[in-house]
Amino acid sequence: MRLNIAIFFGALFGALGVLLFLVAFGSDYWLLATEVAKCSGEQNIENVTFHHEGFFWRCWFNGIVEENDSNIWQFWYTNQPLWKNCTHAYLSPYPFLRGEHNSTSYDSAVIYRGFWAVLMLLGVVAVVTASFLIICAAPFTSHLLYKAGGGAYIAAGVLFALVVMLYVIWVQAVADLESYRHRKMRDCLDFSPSVLYGWSFFLAPAGIFFSLLAGLLFLIVGRHIQIHH
């Protein structure tokens, strides 16, 4: 009875982990950035460029926001324009844009982004493999498959933990937003970029928790089956 309960909750937590990881992987809201520029004589109107990016795409669109309005709601699906500019995020991670930068900082950014992308792909492969192993383990009550699936869930959790850490380091240090701001201020005296973590980013830690928990439960299940069968 206890074994069946452990398998049930392991499968539930594993399914939640897979769902959260796949949504975080496929959505383009790891980073939300707003660029506020006042280049005209109007003081109450702000011309804002909104950026959002994920694993596959980086998109941006322009908007006008009245003073004291919150910019964050512009990223909601229904508030976005029908047409917006998008490019592959791998070659143009914010705040860099392919073709506008021919410097070592851009090359370093692309390489860093490459490591981040590889870790995320490995995490997705690990969590999908774990699910497949657990599905195969259920009919045969195989302790080896349960242990392998549990280990794969834990590996996926560790890989996505590294993904989150690398992204935090990217936003806080590697992106060099201060240099980007100074470069933009050559054309506009008042320019202030603002960067926030998006909802895709926050899905990853939740997926990490459920994936690690599922992995531990399936390792316990595999150990129990090995001893008692």
Curated annotation (Swiss-Prot):
Q: Which residues are glycosylated?
A: N47, N102
Q: What is its main location?
A: membrane
Gene3D superfamilies recorded: 1.20.140.150
Q: Where is this region: Interaction with ITGB1?
A: 49-59
- Cellular component GO terms, alphabetical: plasma membrane
- Biological process GO annotation list? muscle organ development; myotube cell development involved in skeletal muscle regeneration; myotube differentiation involved in skeletal muscle regeneration; negative regulation of myoblast differentiation; negative regulation of myoblast fusion
Task: Give UniProt keywords alphabetically.
Answer: Cell membrane, Glycoprotein, Membrane, Myogenesis, Signal, Transmembrane, Transmembrane helix
Q: How does it sit in the membrane?
A: Multi-pass membrane protein
Which domain of life does the UniProt lineage start with?
Eukaryota
Which parts of the sequence lie on the Extracellular side of the lipid bilayer? 27-114, 172-200
Keyword Cell membrane attributed: yes
InterPro entries, alphabetized: PMP22/EMP/MP20/Claudin, TMEM182
Family classification: Belongs to the TMEM182 family.
Functional description taken from the UniProt entry: Negatively regulates myogenesis and skeletal muscle regeneration via its association with ITGB1. Modulates ITGB1 activation by decreasing ITGB1-LAMB1 interaction and inhibiting ITGB1-mediated intracellular signaling during myogenesis.
Q: How does it assemble?
A: Interacts with ITGB1.
Name recorded for this polypeptide: Transmembrane protein 182
The beginning of the lineage is:
Eukaryota, Metazoa, Chordata, Craniata, Vertebrata
